[in-house]
Amino acid sequence: MKSPTPSRPQKMALIPACIFLCFAALSVQAEETSVTPQPPDILLGPLFNDVQNAKLFPDQKTFADAVPNSDPLMILADYRMQQNQSGFDLRHFVNVNFTLPKEGEKYVPPEGQSLREHIDGLWPVLTRATENTEKWDSLLPLPEPYVVPGGRFREVYYWDSYFTMLGLAESGHWDKVADMVANFAHEIDTYGHIPNGNRSYYLSRSQPPFFALMVELLAQHEGDAALKQYLPQMQKEYAYWMDGVENLQAGQQEKRVVKLQDGTLLNRYWDDRDTPRPESWVEDIATAKSNPNRPATEIYRDLRSAAASGWDFSSRWMDNPQQLNTLRTTSIVPVDLNSLMFKMEKILARASKAAGDNAMANQYETLANARQKGIEKYLWNDQQGWYADYDLKSHKVRNQLTAAALFPLYVNAAAKDRASKMATATKTHLLQPGGLNTTSVKSGQQWDAPNGWAPLQWVATEGLQNYGQKEVAMDISWHFLTNVQNTYDREKKLVEKYDVSATGTGGGGGEYPLQDGFGWTNGVTLKMLDLICPKEQPCDNVPATRPLSESTTQPLKQKEAEPTP
């Protein structure tokens, strides 16, 4: 494949089509060479629906993770025969025919552990191995051990894992980093993409695409050999995200790809199914029923696609932040996703060059440059002075500021003057006493105020540092770390999310109770500890006063959350 010559710029437009046609076969090949495991709602049909609607378990994920003790077809036949008999007990039937997931063991850390010691001690506790699984298990086998988030999350999750891996690398566990990269490469080769998590019911969607960044992280330890080794899988994942682009007309969308009227190619989140999520079955049905003016399948797809975004759920996806049934994830072009796609294209260019394919490297660079222009044109709100999502229905950029706006800075896709404006907007609207707010809207959803999440703290910190905005970056890290430390001092655990309106409180909202563990919080905490403390004086706990600053940080007053975006 030849790269275009500088003297013939009109050929540049052909490059994306050439790449997409060449790699379209990669995802198809992966799909054709594997038998896709069926999720429990399909395997068990009416039995699954009846069990979930009966609310036998406080958490709908419990039965989704239950393992049939025999062929599901035989269990279903027995159910149909017995269900109308006198004295039939559904709970007893489930207990006889299924092995329920074990409750997570409560980890009690040794007395007197520092924050760093606690995290280092958790890595083996959170490590799982499932080289083989039961035939009808919803859990998908993986060849190498992996680290799970913790709590109800008994499987590996895609985007969580990148931030967990940052911590593993910080702890010197490069073998575990390599194992997890190998697992994700295995999933790409087996299923054509990395699913939301290694469960059959997650196969219809992916999550924020961090695989290329995982390979780049591994390359810090193994050099270009890692980039060359995993180039085929990175190409396959890119083909998955761009699937359908070759036949797309201006103004159309296909699965995860969007082609705007001027030909700009961007991406959105998408789930291939439009049914209730097995792990949140009753909740999804209730959400769809609460808005009879919309087709239920449309709401289900948007709920699933929000889960694919990792932000399940947020006012970011909703017309009315107080009504989940107004979410329309698939008609929104996310700024964070397209920043990650830009980074994927840049890493593919680097890996192609490392493999000696300069022509392909040039083509990926061209794609990255085109996407960067698209981000600057469509995902910047000039009136507000921040990056934001693009609305496919109104054909304009949205007004809401969210922590996702820091992603262009994280991947070095932002213009310098805009990065400066983002620093101001972040400090003015999102920074709180306990860290960075996810949004400034209080909706009751977990990806809204007053919750702060570890991955978004790190993206903001790194992104602002990339553009010389070190004071704001340090403010975010310092306030979040203080929150983590205060919570740990009181409860001896790290949690999934934090209330950033104060310090020392776990977050709330969402579909399930607060989870501890917690993979990505552990990883980001280690990275931040090593960021704020000098290398010659590493710290095991958060210092009482902020290091690396001419003065200690002044306490932040809590900002009032806005009622609407």
UniProtKB/Swiss-Prot annotation:
Catalytic site positions: 312, 496
GO function term, MF aspect, one: alpha,alpha-trehalase activity
GO CC terms: periplasmic space
Catalytic activity entry: alpha,alpha-trehalose + H2O = alpha-D-glucose + beta-D-glucose
E.C. numbers: 3.2.1.28
Compartment annotation: Periplasm
Matches recorded under Pfam families: Trehalase
Described purpose of this protein according to its UniProt entry: Provides the cells with the ability to utilize trehalose at high osmolarity by splitting it into glucose molecules that can subsequently be taken up by the phosphotransferase-mediated uptake system.
Assembly notes: Monomer.
NCBIfam families linked: PRK13270.1 (NF009773), PRK13271.1 (NF009774)
Family classification: Belongs to the glycosyl hydrolase 37 family.
Protein name, entry field: Periplasmic trehalase
Upper taxonomic lineage: Bacteria, Pseudomonadati, Pseudomonadota, Gammaproteobacteria, Enterobacterales
